[in-house]
């Protein structure tokens, strides 16, 4: 838009000069258009140079090897072949060679060394376009994004913007939960809740730590948009979509229901599988029933106390 305005401005100026001098019938005063053409050419060249070329990843007969082409289907990068690859996101494309993932730039040069067992694209999984997720020691029997293994976020130059966590969950709402553990999940029944030796915290979409890793359990694989039920020092509470406490971690158990989604922390964590006791009139949907010392307090999904239930 800036260059278009510039061109239109110079064209309008030239037309005004032309009309003025033609009216006076003094053609010798008409200024040549060459400077204007030069400025327009420079503007267009600068505009074109600022854009990345249109490059596309293709597969040979629908599988490996992968290669890249221009918009006309011509192979680029000297017919380079990769075991696997993804489309360019901005000026970076993830590629795999000799079993390791990294990133290349639009010239085909290595932008991030091929040294990871798996990586996502920049801006993927809800993260900012300036960061990408990388993993090592991925469990081949698990979907990579859900594999608990050394996981970090890197910038476009390959610098780590987070330490290696045991797990980084995709961004939900406004933060992504991370776990600083290394040992596998504490309990196969609770593999969506926590690690044996780590705790949960939160990073923002750019990878900045916004909530310290202090929660031993968190319900993450269950759809509860806007809040997350967590446990700290054996007590349950609720965080909002930014990872901030809206119900303090002082309760013995939590019950929540919406449609087919049911969270019953007492049934999930007790060996006997005993459920949270229902209040008079039963449980209502989209309310948080927090139990402490045999008494039940009720909260909305925003953390507001409900009375008279």
Regions found by a protein language model. Name each.
Residues 14-32:
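Short, Lys/Arg-enriched N-terminal segments with co-localized hydrophobic residues
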Residues 35-45:
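Sec-dependent N-terminal signal peptides
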Residues 5, 9-11, 28, 46, ...:
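Serine residues within intrinsically disordered or low-complexity segments
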Residues 11-13, 23, 43-47:
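Intrinsic disorder/low-complexity segments in short proteins, especially the signal peptide
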Residues 1-6, 203:
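Short intrinsically disordered, low-complexity coil segments enriched in acidic
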Residues 50-309:
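Residue-level detector of conserved, function-critical positions
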